[in-house]
């Protein structure tokens, strides 16, 4: 295997194919040092394939490839066999077996692994954003967010932020309390990005009483006082009017239902 070249051909980045090739090379003592792995990514035309086959024929190289488009894959195999060039299809046979096993047809779209990776990292980024800018912790997040949720205590701001983060939306939430002026950023944000979470006084009274009980506290505390709750909700309405944002009533809705409404509003406003 001295001075051998292995051509790694892919219709995407080619990382998968290169890792497989290097894993195989590691089984031959010292051979990896004498073998050059040359990656050729984003191959989408037969012209590039012809060039690679010519190079491999000239220097006795091997072609290893991950090509998912059937026409391109079949062309490489046919031309390599005509030229007596060694080749190995890394992904094709596995896709064929999976089609048989699942009774489904593959999408045959190059780069789907990278698309999935990007989707995953966007989701992680959104979740981290929701944690960082939860409960008005840092008002700078308001202007960076895709969605800003506002509401009095116990209107599901935090669980909604996390749920929407799993849809790759960056969400900041801000508590509305009569004794505390909302951050100025809240009045500078695009009103279409802001959603007010409305709730009926009786429903909120019940939720807060149950919350106090779960903490082993007296449910007669001011936190669950109906007059105090009405005062908070009146203040909330004033802030909503000042911002000019949309409102979603969360009184009798599950988090998932409210999140889907908010997601729909966000999509409609794009």
From Swiss-Prot:
What triggers its expression? Constitutively expressed.
- Reading the lineage from the top rank, the first entry is Bacteria
Query: Pfam families attached here?
Result: Kinase-PPPase
Q: What happens when the gene is disrupted?
A: Lowers the level of gapB and pckA transcription threefold under both glycolytic and gluconeogenic conditions.
Enzyme class, broadest EC rank: transferase
A single Gene Ontology MF term assigned here is:
protein serine/threonine kinase activity
Q: Does the keyword Kinase apply?
A: yes
Q: Which residues bind ADP?
A: 151-158
Q: Which NCBIfam families match?
A: PRK05339.1
Under the heading HAMAP family, the entry gives: PDRP
Under the heading PANTHER family, the entry gives: PYRUVATE, PHOSPHATE DIKINASE REGULATORY PROTEIN 1, CHLOROPLASTIC (PTHR31756:SF3)
Q: Which family does it belong to?
A: Belongs to the pyruvate, phosphate/water dikinase regulatory protein family. PDRP subfamily.
What is the protein name stated in its UniProt record?
Answer: Putative pyruvate, phosphate dikinase regulatory protein
> Mind giving the lineage of the organism this protein is from?
Bacteria, Bacillati, Bacillota, Bacilli, Bacillales
